[in-house]
């Protein structure tokens, strides 16, 4: 069963002052607990499967080079019979039941994906902080680190930063902070949301989220 829920945020500027005139209200379609958890789990599983390369491969006895000649005659030597030196029992032989390239995916339609994302966003509503903009001019990790400290974020915990796009200065300023994940609003996913202990979102990103996932 789906119910409508509302969340509203008042953004902060770069000096930490609230901007009441730029507050944003989002209407979310949220699933009730059991159904919501099930759909979120399915979407996370779909996302994880989509990240797999699926290129791991081993050779069977028929694919390993050589081994065409019978090592020794069938009878009379006292040794165990052998038909090929590329048997899986031999060193340098093929692999039994080894991995082969495959494509693993889980289909979930767009409506279900958006519903899972909206439900998780609502569940995480208390850890979301909105800022008017993340205008990082200098490519300095220390500058972004100090910005987060001023806002009261603990960088020993996972921080998810959502912007409308991953600008180069912002990307370079956050990449050395191991607990900070930068993502654009259009690439937002349930796995990143679930792992986050705190979420920092810009006003433009919140507008994109409203347009892309809550339309």
UniProtKB/Swiss-Prot annotation:
The gene is rpl4. Pfam families: Ribosomal_L4. One of its GO terms (biological process) is translation. GO terms for molecular function: rRNA binding; structural constituent of ribosome. Belongs to the universal ribosomal protein uL4 family. This is Large ribosomal subunit protein uL4c. Coiled coil: none annotated. GO terms for cellular component: chloroplast; ribonucleoprotein complex; ribosome. Residues 51-87 are annotated as: Disordered. Residues 67-78 have a biased composition (Basic residues).
């Amino acid at each position: 069963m789906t119910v409508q829920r509302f969340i509203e945020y008042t953004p902060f500027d770069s000096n930490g002052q609230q901007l009441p005139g730029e507050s944003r209200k989002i209407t979310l379609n949220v699933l009730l607990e059991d159904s919501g958890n099930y759909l979120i789990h399915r979407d996370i599983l779909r996302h994880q499967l989509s990240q797999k390369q699926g290129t791991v491969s081993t050779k069977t006895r028929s694919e390993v080079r050589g081994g065409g000649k019978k090592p020794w005659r069938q009878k009379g030597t006292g040794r165990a019979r052998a038909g090929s030196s590329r048997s899986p029992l031999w060193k340098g032989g093929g692999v039994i039941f080894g991995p082969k390239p495959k494509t693993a995916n889980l289909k979930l339609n767009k409506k279900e994906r958006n519903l899972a994302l909206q439900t998780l966003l609502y569940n995480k509503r208390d850890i979301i902080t909105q800022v008017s903009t993340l205008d990082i001019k200098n490519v300095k990790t220390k500058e972004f680190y100090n910005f987060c400290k001023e806002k009261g974020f603990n960088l020993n915990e996972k921080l998810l930063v959502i912007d409308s796009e991953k600008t180069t200065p912002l990307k370079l300023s956050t990449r050395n902070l191991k607990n900070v994940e930068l993502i654009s609003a259009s690439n937002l996913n349930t796995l990143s949301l679930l792992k986050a202990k705190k979420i920092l979102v810009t006003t433009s990103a919140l507008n994109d989220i409203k347009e892309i996932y809550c339309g």
